[in-house]
């Protein structure tokens, strides 16, 4: 048999009732399926693009050496 709640247990049960509200349960998770995976993939893309741009950026020394000769 379960132990009776008392005043403290009743307080915590009433305080946490909002967590079981239907709008906050599975409905929000099912409303946007895959949003977490999409945000994660987009973040990986952004990090990869930053790494790629830093690796492929011309260095300051090489840009001075490869200037075309003036055609007069």
Curated annotation (Swiss-Prot):
<dbReference type="GO" id="GO:0005739">
    <property type="term" value="C:mitochondrion"/>
</dbReference>
<feature type="transmembrane region" description="Helical">
    <location>
        <begin position="31"/>
        <end position="48"/>
    </location>
</feature>
<dbReference type="InterPro" id="IPR012576">
    <property type="entry name" value="NDUFB3"/>
</dbReference>
<keyword id="KW-0472">Membrane</keyword>
<dbReference type="GO" id="GO:0022900">
    <property type="term" value="P:electron transport chain"/>
</dbReference>
<protein>
    <recommendedName>
        <fullName>NADH dehydrogenase [ubiquinone] 1 beta subcomplex subunit 3-A</fullName>
    </recommendedName>
</protein>
<comment type="similarity">
    <text>Belongs to the complex I NDUFB3 subunit family.</text>
</comment>
<keyword id="KW-0813">Transport</keyword>
<comment type="function">
    <text>Accessory subunit of the mitochondrial membrane respiratory chain NADH dehydrogenase (Complex I), that is believed not to be involved in catalysis. Complex I functions in the transfer of electrons from NADH to the respiratory chain. The immediate electron acceptor for the enzyme is believed to be ubiquinone.</text>
</comment>
<keyword id="KW-0496">Mitochondrion</keyword>
<keyword id="KW-1133">Transmembrane helix</keyword>
<dbReference type="Pfam" id="PF08122">
    <property type="entry name" value="NDUF_B12"/>
</dbReference>
<keyword id="KW-0812">Transmembrane</keyword>
<keyword id="KW-0249">Electron transport</keyword>
<comment type="subunit">
    <text>Complex I is composed of at least 49 different subunits.</text>
</comment>
<keyword id="KW-0679">Respiratory chain</keyword>
<keyword id="KW-0999">Mitochondrion inner membrane</keyword>
<dbReference type="GO" id="GO:0005743">
    <property type="term" value="C:mitochondrial inner membrane"/>
</dbReference>
